[in-house]
Amino acid sequence: MCSSDLSTAAIVQGAIGANQAFAFDLSAACSGLVYGLSVATSLLTRYRRGIVIGAEVLSKLVDWHDRTTAVLFGDGAAGVMIERTSDAIGLAGEELRTFGDKGENLVAGQFGNSNPFSGEISSLDPYFHQNGREVYNFATREVPEALESALKKAKVAADDVDFYLLHQANARIVSSIAKRFGQPIDKFPMNMGTNGNTSAASIGILLDELREAGIIHPGQTIAFVGFGGGLTVGAQIWKI
């Protein structure tokens, strides 16, 4: 996509002085960190190390007069560094899915003419909109299927996962998925009560908080599960 703006990745690369690294943006909304880790992991066959960052400023997209969305979202950023290793750790299995035909159920506003050759001027709406019922039904139906597929590919039983780090969208969705897999809710940590829904940043922020608290540590098996705009779903099983 052509833009007059520098990519966020290029800005970060310059700011941290990573002059030998190439940088690019990837857009997958609330599944962004999971999709980004998938791409970065595939690049480790040719490169040594990479950083995947999920960052969102959702306050710019929220209509503060719309009480159905204004109270739900937050701004945030988090990064994950991965590197090539000969140890038996890393990404063990994943499942990524996109449902573009359902994308209208979760949109973050329109900032330009979708078809400049039509001669019509589109009405611009910069605010976030969602069909809450459809998004909930989508998440509780598609997320378990993607997670189950990732577990099978990783040859890991649900009971053997130490923690499930889900996108922090809705406590009811997280609780529903925990129940679906017969797992205690303690294995599904949540922080949306303090941070809100930070979209692509949410899994990374949660991971950092749990590592700082000493709850997540090397030797564990962790699931990352993103879902949201697109609509998209991504589930990964990591051995750390």
List where the protein language model places each region.
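Flexible, glycine-rich active-site loops centered on histidine and acidic residues
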Residues: 41, 47-77
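Active-site nucleophile and cofactor-binding loops and adjacent substrate-binding regions
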Residues: 23-33, 72, 191-199, 226-227
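Catalytic phosphate/nucleotide-handling subdomain of diverse soluble enzymes
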Residues: 205-225, 233-240
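A glycine- and small-aliphatic-rich helix-loop capping segment at beta-alpha/alpha-beta transitions
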Residues: 8-18, 41-45, 68-72, 181-183, ...
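Short, small-residue-biased leader/transition segments that mark boundaries at the very start
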Residues: 1-3
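Active-site-proximal alpha-helical scaffold in enzymes
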Residues: 24-50, 80-82, 200-216
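Phosphate/pyrophosphate-binding loops at sites that engage ATP/ADP/AMP, CoA/4′-phosphopantetheine
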Residues: 145-162, 210-215
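Condensing-enzyme catalytic core mediating Claisen C-C bond formation in acyl metabolism
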Residues: 66-137, 141, 145, 227, ...
